[in-house]
Each structure stands twice: as structure tokens, then as C-alpha cells.
């Protein structure tokens, strides 16, 4: 199993939405419409080697919410240090680039992971009403390792 890298995210079509440090936006806050989108948010520290793509430190997913808090709720959990992961991110004084990837673009990282372009074209998409973000999150854990997360 390999660590997920920025190259994997870029190949899947992820976009950078900003940078956080200690659970706060660093160098500007993205618009609320961007932060409330359902999908996956990946944190990448800039501590990659000179010839390697930086590894993804952690991943979070956000579903549809009535409150439209989205990724802002994740940052709140980090600031409140509600888990070991949140305490680490809040206290390590490391800036993390935040990448966003909607569930519709997750195929190369989940069911299509490790397949060539032709095989990927014939791999099923995630359109089932029973396919949850939690299941996609588990597929990510099956396919990749993350620096700060064990699962």
C-alpha cells in the first residue's frame, strides 16, 4: 500500500481551496459556498522531499448538511481538539494545503485505483443511492496510507 500524494489528487481532478494552520485559515478564507460543498477534503503538508510529491496527511469527508457548515465544521473540531488527529493538526504548527474533490471524481482513487486508462473507462462510477461517502472513505483507506491517519 502506498501513501496518497498530491500527484494522485491532481490526477483525480482535485482543486486547492486554501491553506490552514492550527485549524484556522492561513492566507485568506475561502467563500462559504466552497466550504459547504459535499465531498472529500484532503490536507497536505508542504514537507515533501525535493524530488517527491508531498504525501496527503489526512482526509475528511462532508455530506449534505442542513446547516451548510461543511468543512468549517471540520475546522471547528480541529480547533476544539476533539480527537488525537485534531490535537496533532492544531498543535504541530504546520501549514496544510486543503484540496477538495467531489464524490463524482473519486473513481480514480477508489474503484478505479491501479487500473490503466482503458480499464478505468470501463470501471463503474459511484451513482448508487446506496453508495455512501463512508464507503468511499473506506475504499480510500484500503488503497492508500495517510501520514496522520491509521485508517
Curated annotation (Swiss-Prot):
Per the record, the GO terms for biological process are:
symbiont-mediated perturbation of host cell cycle progression; symbiont-mediated suppression of host DNA replication
Entry keyword annotation includes Acyltransferase: no
- In terms of superkingdom, the source organism counts as Viruses
Example of a GO MF term: DNA binding
Q: Which InterPro entries match?
A: Phage_Ndd
Question: Which pairs of positions does the record mark as disulfide bonds?
Answer: none
Entry keywords, A to Z: DNA-binding, Host-virus interaction, Inhibition of host DNA replication by virus, Modulation of host cell cycle by virus
Q: Which Pfam families match?
A: Phage_T4_Ndd (PF06591)
Q: What is the stated purpose of this protein?
A: Disorganizes the host nucleoid and inhibits replication, but without host DNA cleavage or degradation. Only the architecture of the nucleoid is affected. May act on the host chromosomal sequences that determine the structure of the nucleoid. Binds to dsDNA but not to ssDNA.
Report the protein name in the record.
Answer: Nucleoid disruption protein
Query: What are the leading ranks of the lineage?
Result: Viruses, Duplodnaviria, Heunggongvirae, Uroviricota, Caudoviricetes
Amino acid at each position: 500500500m502506498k501513501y496518497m500524494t498530491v500527484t494522485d489528487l491532481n490526477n483525480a481532478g482535485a482543486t486547492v481551496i486554501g491553506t490552514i494552520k492550527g485549524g484556522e485559515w492561513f492566507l485568506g478564507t475561502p467563500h462559504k459556498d466552497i466550504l459547504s460543498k459535499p465531498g472529500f477534503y484532503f490536507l497536505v503538508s508542504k514537507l515533501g522531499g525535493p524530488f517527491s510529491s508531498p504525501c496527503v496527511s489526512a482526509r475528511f469527508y462532508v455530506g449534505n448538511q442542513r446547516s451548510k457548515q461543511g468543512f468549517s465544521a471540520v475546522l471547528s473540531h480541529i480547533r476544539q481538539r476533539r480527537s488525537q488527529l485534531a490535537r496533532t493538526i492544531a498543535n504541530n504548527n504546520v501549514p496544510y494545503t486543503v484540496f477538495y474533490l467531489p464524490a463524482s471524481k473519486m473513481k480514480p482513487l477508489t474503484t478505479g485505483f491501479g487500473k490503466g486508462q482503458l480499464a478505468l473507462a470501463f470501471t463503474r462510477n459511484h451513482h448508487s443511492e446506496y453508495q455512501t461517502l463512508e464507503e468511499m472513505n473506506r475504499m480510500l483507506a484500503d488503497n492508500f496510507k495517510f501520514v496522520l491517519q491509521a485508517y
